[in-house]
Curated annotation (Swiss-Prot), chains A, B, C, D:
MF terms (GO), sorted A to Z: GTP cyclohydrolase I activity
Name listed for the protein in its UniProt record: GTP cyclohydrolase FolE2
Name of the gene this protein is made from: folE2
UniProt organism field: Kosmotoga olearia (strain ATCC BAA-1733 / DSM 21960 / TBF 19.5.1)
Gene3D superfamilies attached to this UniProt entry: Urate Oxidase
Superkingdom of the organism of origin: Bacteria
Length: 257, 257, 257, 257
């Protein structure tokens, strides 16, 4: 059968990224407590395509991924990228994967356990060097400092999503990132809280009011002081309870205006 | 050209609903203040198909809709349904449309104006009789009564979405539904609030703590006492600030367990 | 601490459903090939609330779910529902759960294996009796019979999503539902296809053109003839390649116009 | 009342972007045929925040936007950005807005008219200079060249989304971008097609098979040859009818590997 993709292209235009997008695949990721966790990845797998070829070979992306037995670790990502470059005769390879990650947490006073879900992901590229970014989304509670200050009673508060991306010099567990982010908010949130826990979270959060600006800076302070973290991007989106839109703040290391 | 759709089907299975889904079309709806409002509808247009025919004629759904000059009112919906039944030789026709609707609201103390957006919709059917349901989604603020009661200071609160559906004996404006729902919550929410407004909303909501159960019942009380409303379904989903899931309550008129 | 939820409510309005929504939790479901499959559930857990009580106890829903060790089978669902009714002193309990489910499939000619992902779910209720519905979403290929008939060459085709719900007299595997649905379409689809497989799927689908009406009827024919299936609802949504909207057909057993 | 936001911050960390996100507002955009089109914008409005201030003033973003009477043109965007910088004492301002845009198109043979919807947007920044990017998403039809070549009959095809971003030296209408993109695909798609139109589109597309790689290159060829376009990014995502994931290609001007 003719290999249409391998035919010469005369338009003289290289393609930056080509491949498959939105592929769901079962994966196994590292878990600090249980060593391994089964979860579900949503993958984008891309390579570059030189100007001389008409198309890439889409089926090979799946073959490479499938060959790695579902293991998705930083080390494994580099191996997937190398295999993609070889299988597709490419110079650069890109793999991103998003996955839900579960942690068993105990309520702060009652100690009762339950699972909390975090949207995590990896962004990786291999050209000459291997680049790897860890993404973690942490839901937290933010109490508005302005509302607390100007009101005779109460203070508006809400769930906020903190999206962090980090490059690392050495391993930082997802669990550690979550702890740092929760520590930077008005209070952490939980799947299961009994009444005594709810009282505690309500009071702690009221005592620690935080704007989205505060949360982003507090996370950055913690990341700056961790020598394992070489780069970070921190975004905070607060689902304002008094509005139907979000408040947002973003700090990226090394980015000027 | 052969009309494959009109060919006889021998499988002896009537189809309950067939047509097109997810069609975006510019529309004009009634506006209490400005008479008319331009907005964007997302339509589902379905009819039944008797067991004897292989297929419906999809293009006619668009032709019927387009012929009505974008006007979407209760009266107009019935006319669209009648035209669909005729154009497609059907017994029953169904049209649902969802659209964002904007209202200019003034902040409670400063009086400054801004637009608020509400997801609205119509669900309509014509068999022998014409059935019409108005849908309105109203974002509100809910302060947790339990959290307030058990805590020495503060109370967790959050944005909650109140989804109501009503059948009417006579016209009820979208604006009236929104006012009834906002009145049933801890406080209304706004796109633009200056500091004095934020203080007001914070204190008012703290003085009116409401569970999702309370909000649903308070809305129902208002609907029960409005003779124009003959049927209702009220759903409240609160984006709990202390959890990463929603609290939910639903009351439907005439529904037992 | 005061139990605000248990206080008497004087509004005299029972609530049909109250509980938690959108809770993500790790689960284990039955797998025809491997006995068990780890996946991720998104849960809604509701009970009724009599007119005399102000609120339900939201934390107990999570406690009940957590106590079942993540197992989600039809039998286990009934046990969760019973526990919810007891823990929350309710008459009726409702649990819905949606989850991705993976099946290893071999390409039709090359035989190469890969995982395919299917969105599945359970809808269950316990009042006096236990009611259980299995949901499966199957992506398939549909070639338009009209386009093929009237065109001198080619025929437009596209991915279509077939959403089925079934009530069962005895166990039907998710895998069996998928096979019946794929058999009813122009062709099944795969995550990984080599060139010889792509040729096969292209030709097979061209030889079996199917409207959404055809697919829905063909699925129903297979379900009618399976004594294990006591009720079904079949929806087909075709992501029309020549339009930016969907074609849709729906057949529900026992539903008249 | 105390202005908490204006207080001095001692953490010494400037914030790259702070403001509001996901704000829906009614807007009026330019329309080549009808001069003006009412539509609905979803806005992100951000500024930078120097290290010395604790917070920005969120309400002023809405005030600035509201003051511009809903007009959203390139010229107007610069004015919004300037007003944001002044109102918030910022150095840089960012505004992005996404909106649906409708065009009346006539079917290729029958000539019957209907509206097609396109997701469009603007990305604008003002620091010392004003930067403006136009985004347009164009759904098209792609027939797979490989499938056509290797199969004895038929060829798999599908809806593909072409997302383009352009910077301009002088005005390029959204309508012109759409025409260039449709011309680069196997065939354009329409909301309403009668049988003779469907035959035409089926045959034209079969005669013009295009990979995602082909479509991206063909769009780039057209953009390279238009002196009004100074920069482009072209992404093509094809909703593969034989898979449950997308095929993807991306070319960005000036980007190396």
């Amino acid at each position: 059968m003719r290999d249409v993709q391998s035919e010469k292209d005369h338009r003289n235009i290289p393609i930056n990224m080509v491949g498959i997008k939105g592929l769901k695949y079962p994966i196994i990721v590292m878990d600090r407590t249980n060593k391994r966790q089964h979860t579900i990845g949503t993958f984008n797998l891309f390579v570059d395509l030189p100007k001389d070829f008409r198309g890439t070979h889409m089926s090979r992306f799946v073959e490479v991924l499938d060959r790695h037995n579902m293991k998705v670790t930083p080390k494994n990502m580099e191996s997937i990228l190398d295999d993609m470059r070889e299988a597709l005769k490419a110079t650069v390879a890109h793999v991103t994967v998003d996955f839900p990650y579960f942690i068993r947490k105990n309520a702060p006073i009652s100690g009762i356990g339950s699972y909390s879900s975090y949207n995590c992901g990896f962004i990786s590229t291999k050209n000459k060097e291997f680049d790897f970014i860890l993404k973690v989304e942490v839901p937290v509670l933010t109490v508005c400092p302005c509302s607390k200050e100007i009101s005779d009673r109460g203070a508006h508060n809400q769930r906020a999503m903190v999206n962090v991306q980090v490059r690392m010099n050495s391993l930082v567990w997802i669990e550690e990132i979550i702890e740092m982010v929760e520590d930077a908010a008005s209070a952490p949130i939980f799947t299961l809280l009994k009444r005594e826990d709810e009282k505690f979270i309500t009071e702690v959060s009221y005592d620690n009011p935080r704007f989205v600006e505060d949360v982003s800076r507090e996370v950055v302070l913690r990341f700056m002081n961790d020598p394992r973290i070489s780069w970070y991007r921190v975004e905070v989106s607060s689902q304002e309870s008094i509005h139907n839109h979000e408040a947002y703040a973003c700090i990226e290391k090394g980015k000027s205006l």
